[in-house]
Amino acid sequence: MNLVPKSLHHLVRRPRLIIAGTIGTLLFLSLVNYQPMAFAGLIAFDIAAAIFLVLIGILTTRANTASMRHRARIQADNKWVVLLVSLSVAAVVIIALYSELHAAKDKSLGTIALASATILLAWLFVATMFAQQYAHDFYMAPGQLIFPGTEHPNYWDFTYFAVVLSMCCQTSDVAVTSTNMRRLVTLHSIVSFFFNVIIIAITVSVVAGAL
């Protein structure tokens, strides 16, 4: 008997995201009674994102082609739901960061450190979510991306592809060969463009406030 509703399958099959999200939520609920909501949210996100990235890092070093195919198969359902929810969380965090910086009359070292950590973690979180999705899509239908030198790319290869896209809003030496993958790359490029613009704006605000 399956006790898990079908609507939750796409989350249950992503234990690392569940673990990090649960810790972040509990931490936020604990902090919000003593700290401003924006500050509590930023601290909770930073810790949750750091945990998620560590867990994904461990997965990346241990995964092989067979395990990547298996993960792609069990996580194929509702991929857009998970991706869009993740992007929404990152967007809310950036809004909370702007609110916190705007409310702070003086940009102390602690405020600057919090802003820097949040920007870095949010950027890495988004890039990692896209990297995971590229890997899943590739191993559900191999050949959608062509990596020079290998027919069986690992998570590091997909992370490289996603990080370059996040930084430059364009592909590197990897060829995109399917319409499905082009849609995902297009979304990633658009998200990266606006994310990078916002990061520049926040950075200018922090530097100006610190002077």
Task: For each feature predicted by the language model, list its residue ranges.
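Alpha-helical transmembrane segments and their membrane-interface junctions
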Residues: A90-T111, L165-R182
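Membrane-water interface of transmembrane alpha-helices
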Residues: F52-T65, T128-Y139
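The first (N-terminal) embedded transmembrane alpha-helix
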Residues: H10-N33
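Juxtamembrane helix-capping/reentrant segments at transmembrane boundaries
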Residues: M68-S86
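Membrane-proximal soluble regions of multi-pass membrane proteins
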Residues: D137-F138, G143-S178
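Loop-to-helix transition at the N-terminal end of transmembrane alpha-helices
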Residues: M37-V54
